[in-house]
């Protein structure tokens, strides 16, 4: 069976750590590895970001394979591009970060989501628990790409015995 691949964009905030914990909890169930991605702005030194990301990964107690990745670019393009390159099934992203992404709310979060054909699980400041997700909300239109994402939602809902709410 092919190992699934998840992406967790990480800005070194506490909510990014929570997104990582959600990804780990789900990855254990579906046999996935996790690429943890930090995007550094153009002209910035990546060595400190690499060190911070490696420190986070080494301090995370996980049975799941965590792979550090640092890219130079911007979050609006690079998260989606990276997910496509890695053939990711899901992106787990925290919102309301306090450092690099302090403005990832509202339309900025939507820009990141819209830049990718890979489905997102958006988390806030609630940690993952063993029960998974009681409710999953799926915004749905009738284009082909959106319909394809329903298979991933169905898998997650089956694993966690979640109730799915479709919004059109």
Model-derived features: positions:
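Structural beta-alpha unit
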Residues: 1, 15, 41-42, 51, ...
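Intrinsically disordered or low-complexity boundary/linker segments at protein termini
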Residues: 1-14, 95, 114-154
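A structural signal for isolated positions on well-ordered beta-strands in alpha/beta enzyme cores
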Residues: 7, 33-35, 67-69, 137, ...
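Acidic, proline/glycine-rich short linear motifs
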Residues: 21-64, 166-168
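Short glycine/serine/threonine/alanine-rich loop segments
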Residues: 31-33, 88, 118, 162
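Gly/Ser-rich helix-loop-strand patches that form or flank binding pockets
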Residues: 79-129
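A charged, well-structured terminal subsegment
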Residues: 151-163
């Amino acid at each position: 069976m092919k190992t699934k691949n998840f992406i967790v964009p990480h800005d070194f905030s506490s909510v990014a750590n929570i997104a990582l914990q959600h990804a780990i909890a789900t990855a254990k169930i579906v046999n996935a590895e996790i690429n943890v991605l930090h995007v550094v702005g153009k002209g910035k030194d990546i060595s400190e970001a690499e060190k911070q990301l490696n420190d986070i990964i080494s301090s995370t107690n996980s049975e799941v394979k965590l792979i550090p990745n640092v890219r130079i670019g911007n979050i609006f393009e690079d998260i989606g591009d990276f997910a496509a390159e890695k053939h990711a099934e899901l992106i787990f992203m925290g919102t309301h970060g306090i450092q690099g992404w302090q403005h990832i709310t509202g339309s900025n979060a939507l820009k990141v989501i819209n830049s990718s054909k890979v489905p997102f699980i958006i988390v806030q400041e609630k940690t993952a628990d063993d029960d998974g997700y009681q409710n999953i909300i799926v915004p749905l239109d009738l284009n082909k790409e959106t319909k394809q994402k329903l298979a991933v939602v169905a898998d997650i809902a089956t694993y966690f015995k979640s109730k799915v709410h479709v919004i059109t």
